[in-house]
């Protein structure tokens, strides 16, 4: 892919963006390379730029909370990582593999084909705002479906693993219940079990509590807490739950106009934000609550 030449103005602007988006030193410097890396990623819808030369590295096992106003690029970040949306420029890497490019026979990077993308994407699981369960399948069947059909897992093994995962999310007594027989919080927990059934190394959560009332919201957040405490999963979470982000995340990224406007530990972002726009956002959230 041939990228346009950069002007001096472009280079100056990108240098500024890079300084804003440089990740704080939060992991042991002896750890391995990032498990997820966004490199100069740009995504536009017509004239609206939703991701603007974005750079972000996520360490293995790191829990990153993504906050910010609507339209700032938070959910788009997860969608391009899951390849639900394409990007206009840049590269996304998962472990040692590029999600966007692959080497041809001559070792030259070319746009990745579908087979390559599917292989790399299999390392990622995602839970959405909407539950998207199959209404004609029980909770157990919803969790079994993808491992059998996509991974080719033995049905007996898939059933045993699905039962274990539903037990993990607190639904061991709901295996034979249909979505219509479950509360919203229970359906979202089935969706989490379904994503885990694919054995991902990275889990994405896109405002998973936005459609739930406060009590049901707590059920889902408790499951995510449990996953974070008991499993070495890397997590990227778009959330409006500031209390949860403060308590659970290793790092908080504040998005604004397609850029990481500010990032740091939860204490740095919530107790001592440095950017005026971050302060304004957190003040507005506090007043709304």
Regions of interest found by a model, annotated:
Residues 33-266:
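ABC family nucleotide-binding domain
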Residues 1-42, 289:
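ABC-family P-loop ATPase nucleotide-binding domain
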Residues 2-3, 256, 263, 267-289:
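C-terminal boundary and immediately downstream tail of ABC-type ATPase nucleotide-binding domains
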